[in-house]
Regions:
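Sec-exported extracytoplasmic/periplasmic mature domains
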Residues: 24, 28-32, 45, 49, ...
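Alpha-helical scaffolds flanking conserved acidic
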Residues: 80-86, 105, 155-163
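Short, solvent-exposed mixed-charge patches
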Residues: 239-242
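Second-shell loop/turn segments in exported
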Residues: 8-13, 53-60, 71-73, 95-98, ...
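Export/targeting segments at the very N-terminus of extracytoplasmic proteins
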Residues: 45-94, 129-132, 146-150
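Catalytic and substrate-binding regions of cell-wall glycan-acting enzymes that process beta-1,4-linked
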Residues: 2-12, 18-22, 156-225
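Ligand-binding clefts/hinges and TM-proximal coupling segments of bilobed small-molecule sensing domains
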Residues: 24-62, 228-237
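Substrate-binding/active-site groove segments that recognize
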Residues: 97-123, 130-141, 186-188, 212
Length: 242
């Protein structure tokens, strides 16, 4: 149990005793008051509005309607489809009709000039599928060009690419170097490079990446719940409609 009276819970199938025991042990070892437990509480649990925003009925319908496109283009360009979907939610609430005051277009809020750049080269971003493809390809370009290498383990290369999508790759590369010079880990976004970015750029980019990561966690929970539900239906001989 993370806390009593919470608005968000974690449901398990009753025939998953190993998973239940693992989670109970993890929560006991990382309860509030421990270092990791406090980090988790302060970053993700204290305020659940972000999860409710991404997991509302209308938002879930939109997410599920676009999931196949994010899977396709995430796979095509070597990016995590769930992270791309979370980015799309942050940019536009997954709404292709959105246009910004500076001319950014659609789900991924790309400028036409970015989509036309030789490193992207995807036309027709007024249409849904090309818009998501262009966003995925641009993210893949940022990550491969500026934030790849064995030192960037796990999701950190993608988080730095997200920061660059918002604030520009040249600026984030410079601030990453400054983070290393000032004793922070230049290969870790959270609590390291983000500190320097907040100081030098302001909270907008830090909040942008933080929001996307929270939506990413929400979508991962949704994906897991959907997979569990589908498995249970198959086990009982109930097939989902095509």
């Amino acid at each position: 149990m993370l806390r009593e009276g919470a608005r968000l819970g974690w449901a398990l199938r009753p025939n998953s005793p190993k998973l239940k025991n693992f989670l109970n042990t993890f929560l006991q070892d990382n309860r509030e008051g421990t270092l990791f437990g406090n980090i988790i509480r302060n970053r993700y649990i204290r305020d659940f509005d972000w999860a409710e925003n991404a997991a509302g009925a209308e938002e879930l319908t939109r997410y599920r309607a676009l999931s196949a496109l994010f899977r396709k283009y995430g796979t095509d360009y070597g990016m995590d489809p769930t992270l791309l979907a979370a980015q799309g939610f942050q940019e536009s609430r997954l709404d292709q009709s959105v246009r910004s005051h500076v001319g950014a277009v659609g789900v991924m809020q790309l400028l036409p000039s970015t989509a036309e750049d030789k490193n992207v080269g995807i036309p027709n971003i007024d249409e849904l599928a090309p818009n998501i493809e262009a966003g995925a390809k641009y993210m893949a370009f940022l990550k491969a060009r500026y934030f790849s290498g064995p030192e960037l383990e796990g999701i950190n290369g993608s988080l730095l690419a997200l920061a660059s999508y918002n604030a520009g790759p040249g600026r984030i590369r410079r601030l990453r170097r400054e983070a290393g010079e000032r004793g922070y880990d230049p290969n870790q976004w959270f609590d390291n490079v983000e500190v320097i970015v907040a100081e030098q750029v302001g909270r907008e980019t830090v909040q942008y990446v933080s929001n996307i990561f929270k939506y990413y966690l929400t979508y991962r929970w949704i994906n897991s719940a959907d997979a569990e539900r589908a498995a249970a239906r198959r086990a009982t001989g109930i097939e989902d409609a095509p």
